[in-house]
C-alpha cells in the first residue's frame, strides 16, 4: 500500500502546519488587519515557509483550472483584496488597481514595489494554487506585522489565468504598468503557443494598458527574450524604450533583484535580459 504524502498524513507536522495556516487564512483573508484580534493583542504572525507549499514549477494555462472570475470588471469586488481602500460610507473602492504582476510567483516583486508606489494598488496574478496560498499568507503576515503603519495594504494576489480572463478583471486603459518576470520559457516549439507573450495576447495587454503605460519583461533565457522582443516590436501599439531609460527606471532596478527567480539567477551568476515597451496611442479611425 502506497504511503500518504506528509502533507496528507494527519499525524505529520506538515499536515498540522497546513491546517493551521488554512484556518488563519479563512479568518484573516477578508478582514482589515488593524481590526483583527492578533493586532489588538500585539502579536506577530510568522512569515510562511515555502517548503509547506509544494507546487510544480509550471502549470498548463490551457487546462480547466476551475477558476473564479467576474463576468466584467464592474462585477469584481476589489474590497475583499484591498479592504483598507473601501469607503465605509458608500462601500465603494477609493482606488483602482493600476499595476499588475502577471505570473507573480512568490510575490517578491510586489512586496518591493509596495513601499515604492504607496499610492498605487498592485495585483499579482498567479495560476498555481499553493503558490497563490503562500503569497496570500505572506501578505497577511506582512499586513499584520506592519499594522501600525498600514503597511502592504496596497498589494494582494489573485489566483487567475491572465491568458484567458485578463479583460474580465481590468477596464480599458486601467493599468499603468504590467510586469512579466521570468515567465515559463516553454522551450519546445509545439509549446510556444503557451508563452505569455504572443501576438493575440499583446492585443489584450494593449487594451487594459493605458497610453504611455509600460510593459516590463525580464528573463534569464536568451531565446525567450528574443521571442518577446520580436513580438512586442512587431505589434503596432508597442514601442521599445531605450537602454538609457531602463538604466534610470526605478521599476527595472527593483525587477532585477526583487523576484525569487531573479535572486536564483544572481546566485548562479546567470544573465538577466530586460526589455521594456511603452504603450503607443491608438491610431484614430478616419
Curated annotation (Swiss-Prot):
The keyword Coiled coil does not apply. Keywords: Methyltransferase, Nucleus, Phosphoprotein, RNA-binding, S-adenosyl-L-methionine, Transferase, tRNA processing, tRNA-binding. S-adenosyl-L-methionine binds at residues 103, 126-127, 161-162, 181, 259-261. The active site is at 184. The keyword S-adenosyl-L-methionine applies. It is an enzyme of class 2 (transferase). GO terms for molecular function: tRNA (guanine(46)-N7)-methyltransferase activity; tRNA binding. CDD domains: AdoMet_MTases. Its EC number is 2.1.1.33. It comes from the Eukaryota. It is found in: Nucleus. The modification Phosphoserine is found at residues 7, 59. It catalyses: guanosine(46) in tRNA + S-adenosyl-L-methionine = N(7)-methylguanosine(46) in tRNA + S-adenosyl-L-homocysteine. PROSITE patterns: SAM_MT_TRMB. GO terms for cellular component: nucleus; tRNA methyltransferase complex. Methyltransferase that catalyzes the formation of N(7)-methylguanine at position 46 (m7G46) in tRNA, a modification required to maintain stability of tRNAs; its absence resulting in tRNA decay. Both the D-stem and T-stem structures of tRNAs are required for efficient methyltransferase activity. Forms a complex with TRM82. This is tRNA (guanine-N(7)-)-methyltransferase.
Amino acid at each position: 500500500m502506497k504511503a500518504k504524502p506528509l502533507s496528507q498524513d494527519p499525524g505529520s507536522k506538515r499536515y498540522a502546519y497546513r491546517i493551521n495556516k488554512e484556518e488563519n487564512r479563512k479568518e484573516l483573508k477578508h478582514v482589515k488587519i488593524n481590526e483583527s484580534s492578533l493586532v489588538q493583542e500585539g502579536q506577530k504572525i510568522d512569515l510562511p515557509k515555502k517548503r509547506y507549499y509544494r507546487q510544480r514549477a509550471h502549470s498548463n494555462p490551457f487546462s480547466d483550472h476551475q477558476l473564479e472570475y467576474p463576468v466584467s470588471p464592474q462585477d469584481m469586488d476589489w474590497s475583499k483584496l484591498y479592504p483598507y481602500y473601501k469607503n465605509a460610507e458608500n462601500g465603494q473602492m477609493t482606488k483602482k488597481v493600476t499595476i499588475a504582476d502577471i505570473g507573480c510567483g512568490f510575490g517578491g516583486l510586489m512586496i518591493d514595489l509596495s513601499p515604492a508606489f504607496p499610492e498605487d494598488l498592485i495585483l499579482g496574478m498567479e495560476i498555481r494554487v499553493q503558490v497563490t496560498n503562500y503569497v496570500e499568507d505572506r501578505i497577511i503576515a506582512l499586513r499584520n506585522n506592519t499594522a501600525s503603519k498600514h503597511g502592504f495594504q496596497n498589494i494582494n494576489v489573485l489566483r487567475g489565468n491572465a491568458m484567458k480572463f485578463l479583460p474580465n478583471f481590468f477596464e480599458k486603459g486601467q493599468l499603468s504598468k504590467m510586469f512579466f518576470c521570468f515567465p515559463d520559457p516553454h522551450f519546445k516549439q509545439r509549446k510556444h503557443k503557451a508563452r505569455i507573450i504572443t501576438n493575440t495576447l499583446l492585443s489584450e495587454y494593449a487594451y487594459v494598458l493605458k497610453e504611455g503605460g509600460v510593459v516590463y519583461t525580464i528573463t534569464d533565457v536568451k531565446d525567450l527574450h528574443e521571442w518577446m522582443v520580436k513580438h512586442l516590436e512587431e505589434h503596432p501599439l508597442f514601442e521599445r524604450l531605450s537602454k538609457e531609460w531602463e538604466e534610470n527606471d526605478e521599476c527595472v532596478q527593483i525587477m532585477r533583484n526583487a523576484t525569487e527567480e531573479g535572486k536564483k539567477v544572481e546566485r548562479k551568476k546567470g544573465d538577466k535580459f530586460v526589455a521594456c515597451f511603452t504603450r503607443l496611442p491608438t491610431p484614430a479611425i478616419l
